[in-house]
Regions:
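Bacterial Sec-dependent N-terminal signal peptides
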Residues: 1-30
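Intrinsically disordered, low-complexity linker/terminal regions across diverse proteins
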Residues: 27-147
Length: 147
């Protein structure tokens, strides 16, 4: 194998590694916006327990501020050994779930804004339909906002 072939393979490997690394960290951000969702009317999958999950690859503790747009701002600390799980609520009228009868209204008191001093991962999970179904919303952070 020629040196020039090895050089080209090295450059391609390096480019692929950078490309993959960029996408793997796309969910890692210092700011996350979690919008509310709604349920189907007359559904057998009524939302039940809902949890906000926050984690980080950081070994050192990271301060996190969770702004529940309907209530208060709460401060927490997370690390890679101590992720955070916050109980959001139960049913179809919580900070995360909007009743289907309200979807045509302007809603300004639902959803979350999560801010941290170092990058964190954020997801919101719920169980529905007598514990038989589950769903998850994973925040892409600021990279999810586009250009």
């Amino acid at each position: 194998m020629k040196v020039s072939d090895l050089h080209i393979k090295f450059k391609l490997s390096l480019a692929l590694t950078i490309f993959v690394t960029t996408f793997l960290s796309a969910q890692l951000s210092r700011t996350h916006y979690i919008p509310p969702i709604t349920t189907a009317a007359n559904s057998n999958a009524t939302p039940q327990n809902q949890y906000l999950h926050i984690s980080t690859p950081s070994i050192t503790p990271v301060n996190v501020e969770v702004n529940d747009l309907g209530n208060v701002i709460s401060n927490y600390t997370v690390s890679n050994a101590n992720p955070l799980e916050i109980y959001v609520g139960f049913g179809d009228n919580t900070s995360f779930v909007v009743p289907s009868s309200n979807i045509e209204s302007e809603i300004s008191n639902k959803g979350f804004i999560i801010q941290s001093e170092k990058p964190v991962y954020v997801s919101l999970r719920l169980v529905a339909g007598n514990q038989n179904q589950a769903g998850s919303l994973v925040s892409k952070g600021l990279s999810g906002l586009g250009n």
